[in-house]
Regions:
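Phosphate/NTP-binding elements of NTP-utilizing enzymes
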Residues: 2-167
Length: 167
């Protein structure tokens, strides 16, 4: 098919057909952009290097650090439970410079948890601010701005996953 043939076929579409084509193309482009994402070789720890369960994502603005952490946390929640004694099998933490940064960036931001799993519910109680999944898994949000905030981190309890978010 030549470019001219394609132009003629597109010009012959009804408005409804053109809208359907646009919708399908948008979906394919979105899937190609996000679902086919693969890390660069330098973003994956080599097999022979022991990570001790820690990994650092270092990059500039817009390089996908928050997106990567949110995807990982959602995959972690949907994976096997870390502790069968805990509702939902997972107790996690999100730590940011302030609690507001954790909410705005890690939860509600364009690359945050809600963008990857709309089932996530943000709850604030006397015990703090939590992100909860329907399964019962939860992530507690912490700020690290003041000495009192840091003291709260010490009383946070054991967690199977900790996400340190920059602001």
């Amino acid at each position: 098919m030549t470019v001219t043939d394609l132009r003629e076929r597109l010009a012959g579409l009804t408005e409804a057909e053109a809208d359907l084509l646009e919708t399908k193309l948008r979906a394919k482009l979105w899937a190609k952009r996000w679902n086919a994402w693969t890390p660069y070789p330098w973003q994956v720890p080599p097999d022979e290097v022991e990570t001790h369960g820690m990994w650092l994502q270092l990059g500039g603005r817009g390089t996908g650090k928050t997106d990567g952490c949110a995807r990982y946390m959602v995959a972690h929640v949907n994976g096997p439970p870390c502790d069968d004694r805990v509702p939902g099998g997972h107790r996690m933490s999100i730590i940011a410079p302030t609690q507001g940064d954790a909410v705005e960036s890690a939860v509600n931001g364009p690359s945050g948890l809600k963008a990857h799993d709309p089932r996530v519910a943000l709850r604030t109680t006397a015990g703090g601010t939590h992100v909860r999944w329907p399964s019962g898994a939860e992530a507690k949000l912490f700020g690290a701005h003041t000495p009192d905030d840091v003291e709260r981190l010490r009383s946070g309890g054991n967690r199977c996953l900790v996400w340190l978010e920059e602001a």
